[in-house]
């Protein structure tokens, strides 16, 4: 897996600019609503990343729409195009469940993959660019950062692209996660993490092991693209996001110890927020416009107190917005879809393709095509999708089709649903399952149902009737008409060729 190498975010921006994938905006633009409007229009048109050099009221530039096209996501992962992300998925599938070598030759063949992983621990630096400027105590003022307000009814400015670094009390490896953070004071943010996410689990374990003690936490903004994307990729629990970022980049991830705690953050990050969560300190978060296209309801989450801000000289603030697809998370979903396919195929070799339509909020609906081998096979695959990766815990609908259907073409999928399904026989309903608390359609916050649709051809045992045979064209006739097609001049305004 040959990787394009970027040492930091600035390296990546330089390459994007050289390829016409970055636009500098010198006109003053307000982080309150205006940047969102410009970024949204640009993303919908397949446009470039945007660097707002003069946000109104601030001296720090704002980077937006960085991963606004699948191509830029692939480039951030060190690949030339989206199709190459299948190779990233194959590597992750191997790391998630490596098969023991079948013999000496197989061991020799697998050795490069093992060496790749073993050679990718982090590189710890004594000093780092992210600590060129340091403020602490009363000098900490988050209002100096051009944090965006994305939608008219949002509760407050919102940090969206922060890499939250945590470590549980019984773990050597750190966790990297991306959780939105509402600004509620000059040194206070609300950490919105769902209970099953790595940061929340680390915090729960800390509270159990150290009652009443402050939980150390750091947030990195503007890390290199491989590290950012490593935090949103289904990395095996045995592999750190930093090590995975090193695999993508082809070089070890450089980290530095924080000023105020023992956590390690990306050395090249533009900005780092250091601080703690006081056990029991909670605050109401929201409402915010989110990836569903609606404002979510208010809920309580822990408060993150910032004690130190470290940053690079001339730091860049990296931000985004979320809204009804398409938005940047939806684009990320389209690209990461290619990573998921080999991981699922490793566990379920019968899967031909897997697709998360972006219009389905990137994870709430999945279409799977399989090489069906027995009656009931589609139901096994549904259950597998819901249970195998925690990324699909909140997928509400799974549609399973045969491999003659294109999972990415709604014409094909709807044809299969309407011709191969009996609603009563082929619909699976599962009640009282975990659901994203942002899903207001569920009857209870965080708990709802799931639906599986078996749109495959039915086998003996699944139906008593003779099954329909698809219409297929006569290949000889097709070849003959191909040969005389131009002479027919049907699309040539009636003129002879």
Swiss-Prot record:
A Gene Ontology BP annotation from the UniProt entry: ubiquinone biosynthetic process
EC number from the UniProt entry: 4.1.1.98
Record note on cofactor: Binds 1 prenylated FMN per subunit.
InterPro entries: UbiD (IPR002830), UbiD-like_C (IPR049381), UbiD-like_N (IPR049383), UbiD_bacteria (IPR023677), UbiD_Rift_dom (IPR048304)
Binding site for prenylated FMN: 178-180, 192-194, 197-198
Location (main, coarse): membrane
The keyword Transport appears for this protein: no
Pathway recorded for this protein: Cofactor biosynthesis; ubiquinone biosynthesis
GO cellular component, one term: cytosol
Residues that, per the record, bind Mn(2+): 175, 241
Entry keyword Transcription: no
Cofactors (names): prenylated FMN; Mn(2+)
Reaction(s) the record says it catalyses: a 4-hydroxy-3-(all-trans-polyprenyl)benzoate + H(+) = a 2-(all-trans-polyprenyl)phenol + CO2
Gene3D superfamilies: Single helix bin (1.20.5.570), UbiD C-terminal domain-like (3.40.1670.10)
Pfam families linked: UbiD (PF01977), UbiD_C (PF20696), UbiD_N (PF20695)
Subcellular localization(s) per the UniProt record: Cell membrane
UniProt topology in membrane: Peripheral membrane protein
Family assignment from sequence similarity: Belongs to the UbiD family.
Subunit and partners: Homohexamer.
Function description: Catalyzes the decarboxylation of 3-octaprenyl-4-hydroxy benzoate to 2-octaprenylphenol, an intermediate step in ubiquinone biosynthesis.
Protein name as catalogued: 3-octaprenyl-4-hydroxybenzoate carboxy-lyase
Species lineage: Bacteria, Pseudomonadati, Pseudomonadota, Gammaproteobacteria, Enterobacterales
Gene that this polypeptide is encoded by: ubiD
């Amino acid at each position: 897996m040959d990787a394009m190498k970027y040492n930091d975010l600035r390296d990546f921006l330089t390459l994007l600019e050289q390829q016409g994938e970055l636009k500098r905006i010198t006109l003053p633009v307000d982080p309150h609503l205006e940047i969102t409007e410009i970024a949204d229009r640009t993303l919908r048109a397949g446009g470039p990343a945007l660097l707002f050099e003069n946000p109104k009221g601030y001296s720090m530039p704002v980077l937006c729409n960085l991963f606004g096209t699948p191509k830029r996501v692939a480039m951030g992962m060190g690949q030339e195009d989206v199709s190459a992300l299948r190779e990233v998925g194959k590597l992750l599938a191997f790391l998630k469940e490596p098969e023991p070598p079948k013999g000496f030759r197989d061991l020799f063949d697998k050795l490069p993959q093992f060496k790749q992983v073993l050679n990718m621990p982090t590189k710890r630096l004594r000093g780092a660019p992210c600590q060129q400027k340091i403020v602490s105590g009363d000098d900490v003022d988050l209002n100096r950062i051009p944090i965006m307000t994305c939608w008219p009814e949002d509760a407050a400015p919102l940090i969206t692209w922060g890499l939250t670094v945590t470590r549980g009390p019984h773990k050597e490896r750190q966790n990297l996660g991306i959780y939105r953070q509402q600004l509620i004071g000059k040194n206070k943010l609300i950490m919105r993490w769902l209970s099953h996410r790595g940061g929340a689990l680390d915090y729960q374990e800390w509270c159990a092991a150290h009652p009443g003690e402050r939980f150390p936490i750091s947030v990195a903004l503007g890390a290199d693209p491989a590290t950012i994307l490593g935090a949103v990729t289904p990395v095996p629990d045995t592999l750190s996001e930093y090590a995975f970022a090193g695999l993508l980049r082809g070089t070890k991830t450089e980290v530095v110890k924080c000023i105020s705690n023992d956590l390690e953050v990306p050395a090249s990050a533009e900005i780092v927020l250091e601080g703690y969560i006081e056990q029991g300190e909670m605050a109401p978060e929201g409402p915010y416009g989110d990836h569903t296209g609606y404002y979510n309801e208010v809920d309580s989450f822990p408060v993150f107190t910032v004690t130190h801000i470290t940053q690079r000289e001339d730091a860049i603030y990296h931000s985004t917005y979320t809204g009804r697809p398409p938005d940047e998370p939806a684009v990320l979903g389209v690209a990461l879809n290619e990573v998921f396919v080999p991981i699922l195929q490793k566990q379920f070799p019968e899967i031909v393709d897997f697709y998360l339509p972006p219009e389905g909020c990137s994870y709430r609906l999945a279409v799977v095509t399989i090489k069906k081998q027995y009656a009931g096979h589609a139901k096994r695959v549904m259950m597998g999708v819901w249970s195998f990766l925690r990324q699909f815990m909140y997928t509400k609908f799974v549609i399973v089709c045969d491999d003659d259907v294109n999972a990415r073409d709604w014409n094909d999928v709807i044809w299969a649903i309407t011709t191969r399904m009996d609603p009563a026989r082929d619909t699976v309903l599962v009640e009282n399952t975990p659901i994203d608390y942002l899903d207001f359609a569920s009857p209870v916050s965080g708990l709802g149902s799931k639906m599986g649709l078996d749109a495959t051809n039915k086998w003996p045992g699944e139906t008593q009737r003779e099954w329909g045979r698809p219409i297929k064209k006569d290949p000889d006739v097709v070849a003959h008409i191909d040969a005389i097609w131009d002479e027919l001049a049907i699309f040539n305004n009636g003129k002879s060729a």
